[in-house]
Amino acid sequence: AGFWLEGGMSNDTGTGQGGGAAGPGFEFKRRSTISLMGGFGEVRLGRELTVGYVNSTAADVFGDNGVGASIGKSHFAGVIETRKGNGISYILPSNLGGFYGQVQYVFGEQLSSAAYDKAGDYLGARLGYRNGPLDTAIGFAKGRGASAADDADQFNIFASYDLGVVKPFIGFNQEKNKAAVQVKYQSYLLGLTAPVG
């Protein structure tokens, strides 16, 4: 069993920062989870990064930090997000011959009498393969908005291959909503890292 409490703050003022709408004090809004782990994998409850976000930033040579990071920012705020609370995740065990993955469901905390009781719900999954220099994964997600027309789907895929002297990255991310006049965003990422020193 385990737990994880993570928050951010400005090192000069101590003001709480990041992980969602932060108040004046320190908050565990980056991650706050409890987990049960074993040979079966891991079951995790709480607030954490969404699988769609994790998969989109895996193709970024800056990860999800730094001046050059794409940050996997969604065009449908509040629907396809960086982090979600009230979630349950299952993570595959690490002994599957290089295969890894995660399934995540988030409850939107709506009353059954609400006009759209699915608002805030989120379902995502990613499956990848990592072996030697190769790492690749595919991800899918569905986020529920304030109404059915605000619902959005996300699809992304990435791959990287470590050649020793350089490591190329390539990624693709697509998000589209369910409005009568559909809005679709597609983004591509190509990067390269090289060891120095």
Language-model regions, residue ranges each:
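Outer membrane beta-barrel
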Residues: 1-108, 119, 128-135
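Outer-membrane beta-barrel proteins
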Residues: 12-16, 54-57, 110-114, 145-150, ...
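Detector for outer-membrane/organellar transmembrane beta-barrel domains
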Residues: 118-197
